[in-house]
């Protein structure tokens, strides 16, 4: 079924998991609040509404995580210095305890979006030491990008997925430029990180406090110190942003430098061409597969009422709360056990 859904998406024909639901007139329950409160959305035969709907179950997060995992696994296999979700980069700029609380919350909730509004800290998806071309910061730059690579340095990366039917695909840039939807989304990442850093600075380091003596706060300074945050964006049709392509190329170069003799290639450049082609195929298959799986998972919620969706969401929240309580109880048990441990010098050791 995954293959059939992926092919239907690529060819622009009716989606196998949405076609029958659309013929039966089934709907997706509308939100409880807002301008569209109580207004159900009819399922379309192509599955666009199913793909972009915000539903319980965390399917969009699963799609994001599986895609990101494959990309960073490629980087690690190639020998690039890769750190996933580096939570200590901003630790020194945050008050004591705030970063630890953010990390604990992310672990308990299975959250991979630490930079989202309302979170306690800034947690990028990865920090990778790499040499890449200058980041694209405008639509014009995307048309004729600079391909000269900058010196090796640690960069921050954030993975995003763009689903069919969202505003990114309806924009003028998406209609005008090939890959415009993912490029535009990638260029939004830097601004989102800086806004979130500024928000945290306002909370923890208001202007005038000892640590906020510069035009920008200490948390935003950390973001700026890492150059521009790179957006690794994957689209609904298997396309990806320039930074994904450049990262795959850099991984292939690193692997070719290390393995070209072992591969039996006459030169490093021949090994590079083989490796980069395999990385592109591998990444493309995973990106398309996860988009198809996302649509299949989402289709399970078609026809349910808003009350049923709310009940599912509340049950998942209760399960998360129970996991959090269990973690706290386990930590407390360790503390109690440690209090009864007799030091070695008292045991005569």
PLM feature spans:
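Domain-level cores of phosphate- or acyl-group-handling catalytic modules
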Residues: 82-84, 127-128
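Long, charged, glycine-rich C-terminal linkers/tails
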Residues: 84-90
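Non-catalytic C-terminal interaction segments of nucleic acid-processing enzymes
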Residues: 1-36, 56-59, 72-73, 77, ...
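Gly/Pro/Ser/Thr-rich low-complexity, intrinsically disordered segments predominantly at protein N-termini
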Residues: 42, 70-73, 80
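Short Cys/His-based metal-binding microdomains
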Residues: 31-67
């Amino acid at each position: 079924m995954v293959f059939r859904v992926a092919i239907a998406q690529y060819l622009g024909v009716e989606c196998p998991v949405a076609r029958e639901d659309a013929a039966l007139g089934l709907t997706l329950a509308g939100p409880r609040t807002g301008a569209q409160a109580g207004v159900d959305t009819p399922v379309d035969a192509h599955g666009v509404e199913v793909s972009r709907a915000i539903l319980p179950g965390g399917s969009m997060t699963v799609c994001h995580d599986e895609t990101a995992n494959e990309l960073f696994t490629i980087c690690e296999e190639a020998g690039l210095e890769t750190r996933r979700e580096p939570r200590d980069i901003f630790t020194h700029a945050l008050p004591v305890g705030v970063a630890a609380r953010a990390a604990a919350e992310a672990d308990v909730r299975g959250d991979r979006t630490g930079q989202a509004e309302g979170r306690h800290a800034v947690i990028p998806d990865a920090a990778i030491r790499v040499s890449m071309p200058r980041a694209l910061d405008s639509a014009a730059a995307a048309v004729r990008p600079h391909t000269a690579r900058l010196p090796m340095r640690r960069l921050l990366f954030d993975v995003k997925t763009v689903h069919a039917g969202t505003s990114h695909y309806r924009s003028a840039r998406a209609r005008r430029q090939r890959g415009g939807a993912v490029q535009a989304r990638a260029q939004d990442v830097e601004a989102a990180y800086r806004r979130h850093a500024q928000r945290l600075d306002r909370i923890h380091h208001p202007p005038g406090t000892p640590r906020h003596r510069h035009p920008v706060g200490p948390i935003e300074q950390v973001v700026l110190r890492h150059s521009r945050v790179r957006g690794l964006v994957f689209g609904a049709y298997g396309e990806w942003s320039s930074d994904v392509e450049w990262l795959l190329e850099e991984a292939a170069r690193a692997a070719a430098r290390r393995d070209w003799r072992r591969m039996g290639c006459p030169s490093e450049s021949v090994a590079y061409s083989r490796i980069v082609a395999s990385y592109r195929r591998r990444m493309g298959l995973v990106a398309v597969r996860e988009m198809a799986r996302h649509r299949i998972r989402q289709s399970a919620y078609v026809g349910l009422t808003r009350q049923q969706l709310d009940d599912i969401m509340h049950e998942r929240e209760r399960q998360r709360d129970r996991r959090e309580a269990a973690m706290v109880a386990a930590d407390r048990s360790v503390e109690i056990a440690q209090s009864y441990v007799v030091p070695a010098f008292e045991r005569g050791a």
